[in-house]
Swiss-Prot record:
Species name: Pelobacter propionicus (strain DSM 2379 / NBRC 103807 / OttBd1)
Presence of the UniProt keyword Cytoplasm in the record: no
UniProt-listed PROSITE patterns: RIBOSOMAL_L3 (PS00474)
Protein name: Large ribosomal subunit protein uL3
Similarity field: Belongs to the universal ribosomal protein uL3 family.
GO MF entry, a single one: rRNA binding
Gene3D superfamilies assigned to the protein according to its UniProt record, in alphabetical order: 3.30.160.810, Translation factors
Protein's job: One of the primary rRNA binding proteins, it binds directly near the 3'-end of the 23S rRNA, where it nucleates assembly of the 50S subunit.
GO cellular component, one term: cytosolic large ribosomal subunit
Gene from which the chain derives: rplC
Keyword Repeat belongs to the record: no
Entry keywords, A to Z: Ribonucleoprotein, Ribosomal protein, RNA-binding, rRNA-binding
Biological-process GO terms, alphabetical: translation
Amino acid sequence: MKKGIIGKKIGMTQIFTEDGTRVPVTVIQAGPCVVTQKKTASIDGYSAVQVGFDSTPAANASKPMLGHCTKSGQGVFRYLREFKFDAASEMNLGDVLTVEQFTAGDFVDVTGTSIGKGFQGVIKRYNFRGGRASHGSRFHRAPGSIGASATPSRVFKNKKMPGQLGNTQVTMQCLQVIRVDADDNLLLIKGAIPGHRNNIVLIKNSVKA
């Protein structure tokens, strides 16, 4: 059965297993999330559920968002995301998704927005080797030639060049759930996940596990 929930990255810490092994983990505040919309194959072309996370005052929401969220009867939410569940047809508006759907030992995929680094050169962006640092060298951190002048007289698509680094959607696959704290809605996942603290992430069961 497919699982999914919206969460917020709290930070990283470390825990110790019974045999004394130190395990680095990322702490995620996962849910609770509320089903705000059901999508069906007959109407929308696919089956999915839209869930809301992080309640916000109604005064902060636009009128379209206010009207959309009030259908669930659970208030207004700051973040809305979709999940394609096998049991989407069995869910109803207002149903609550909690962290209890996961158990320790599960493998999940975590999708988030990576930390933005701004405009960077090819050495930082693509790990280019760079030029010599010795006396007389005129080539240090430049990318070098990007194409010939006669043929093909253009720069090929996807040429590695300076540009924006980070601030893109990244998915980390097959991360193991170490601990589930249902009382505080916390997930402890082994290793690092994309983004800075308070970054919104999507947690789904792994497609490769």
